[in-house]
Swiss-Prot record:
GO CC entries: ribonucleoprotein complex; ribosome
Gene name as annotated: rpsK
Family of this protein: Belongs to the universal ribosomal protein uS11 family.
Lineage: Bacteria, Pseudomonadati, Pseudomonadota, Gammaproteobacteria, Alteromonadales
InterPro entries in the record: Ribosomal_uS11 (IPR001971), Ribosomal_uS11_bac-type (IPR019981), Ribosomal_uS11_CS (IPR018102), Ribosomal_uS11_sf (IPR036967)
Organism the protein comes from: Pseudoalteromonas atlantica (strain T6c / ATCC BAA-1087)
Keyword Ribosomal protein included in the entry's annotation: yes
Pfam families, alphabetized: Ribosomal_S11
Name this protein carries in UniProt: Small ribosomal subunit protein uS11
GO MF annotations in UniProt: rRNA binding; structural constituent of ribosome
Keyword Nucleotide-binding assigned: no
One biological process term in Gene Ontology: translation
Length: 130
């Protein structure tokens, strides 16, 4: 039986983006780093859990640093130079993720804290008794 002719397609070139935004969601259990363009379309993302850390090691500053490095290197294919950073959450990976993006060669133009603060909304969880 003859093989069907395969259609040759060229790989589409990645679009070039000069300025972007980095969204860092630092919870107590994990850190999610998403790098987007100016319109908010995701270019790359990485998490502490997806970077090989499991359990309580996900919530360490080093895990957040590794996640930010992975997201930063994946976004370099788009030609990003400048980043505006938005940090959300009280987690331990806030500062180290920003430092890792800076060390990856990005010029950080602005850092904004967008942590949602309730105006006396839902009742918070009870305090832990260890």
């Amino acid at each position: 039986m003859a093989k069907a002719p395969t259609k040759s397609t060229r790989k589409r070139a990645k679009r070039q983006v000069a300025d972007g935004m980095a969204h860092i969601h630092a919870s107590f259990n994990n850190t999610i780093v998403t790098i987007t363009d100016r319109q908010g379309n995701a270019l790359s993302w990485a998490t502490s859990g997806g970077s090989g850390f499991r359990g309580s090691r996900k919530s360490t500053p080093f895990a957040a640093q590794v996640a930010a490095e992975r997201a930063g290197t994946a976004a370099q294919d788009y030609g990003l130079k400048n980043l505006e950073v938005f940090v959300k959450g009280p987690g331990p990976g806030r500062e180290s993720a920003i430092r890792a993006l800076n060390a990856a060669g990005y010029k950080i133009t602005n850092i904004t804290d967008v942590t949602p603060i309730p105006h006396n909304g839902c009742r918070p969880p009870k305090k832990r008794r260890v």
